A protein has these predicted regions:
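Structured N-terminal alpha/beta-domain signature
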Residues: 1, 14, 92-95, 138, ...
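Extended active-site and interfacial segments that coordinate phosphate-rich ligands
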Residues: 1-9
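Short acidic, S/G/P-rich loop/turn micro-motifs used as interaction or catalytic elements
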Residues: 35-38, 128, 136
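A generic structural motif
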Residues: 125-131
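Conserved catalytic core of nucleic-acid polymerases
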Residues: 8-122, 149-151
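Polymerase palm active-site segment centered on the conserved acidic dipeptide of motif C
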Residues: 133-164
Length: 164
């Protein structure tokens, strides 16, 4: 895998691309889901990404299936139409994201068991909690869930969904 270090992943991409943070985030998602742009194909991260896509495609064709990391879900060649290397990578990427999120949710529900604090909304990569005033320590326990999985987080708080 590629080591981004301790900093924010999109800030690292911004430095690689020599663009601002928002543009870096946009460029990264476009390339992960649509294919690596020629002007970035020599960056170490995208070299590794391209190699991962190529080896998965070869394995998929040779074995007739590809087994996803974490979930062990099998994408079977005889069940999927119009497959290509990038599309297969997208399927694997989304499966991996879902698998990681299930692990996060499982651990968070363990932290919240018996507590008044509740997870009230989960979308994609965001989690909204209604934190009981007497349970502020729960937030640190939730942060620890992400730390143990080596995931970076950003947090905001407020009295309503607008964080005011």
């Amino acid at each position: 895998g590629y080591d981004f270090g301790e900093g924010d992943i999109h800030a690292n991409f911004a430095a690689m691309y020599k663009v601002d943070y928002a543009k870096a985030k946009e460029l990264t998602f476009k390339q992960l889901y649509g294919g690596v742009f020629d002007n970035y194909k020599d960056l170490p991260f995208f070299k590794l990404t391209s190699e991962y896509i190529r080896t998965n495609w070869e394995k998929y064709n040779a074995e007739g299936k590809l087994i996803c990391p974490i979930s062990n879900y099998e994408f079977k060649r005889d069940e999927l139409e119009n497959m290509n290397p990038q599309k297969l990578f997208n399927y694997v990427l989304q499966n991996l994201e879902t698998s990681v999120n299930i692990e996060i949710l499982y651990r968070i529900f363990g932290v919240l068991k018996g507590k008044n604090t509740k997870l009230v909304l989960y979308t994609y990569d965001s989690f909204l909690f209604d934190v009981d005033d007497s349970e502020k320590e729960v937030l640190e326990q939730i942060k620890e869930v992400f730390n143990k999985l080596k995931l970076q987080i950003k947090s905001k708080h407020g009295h309503n969904y607008d964080f005011k």
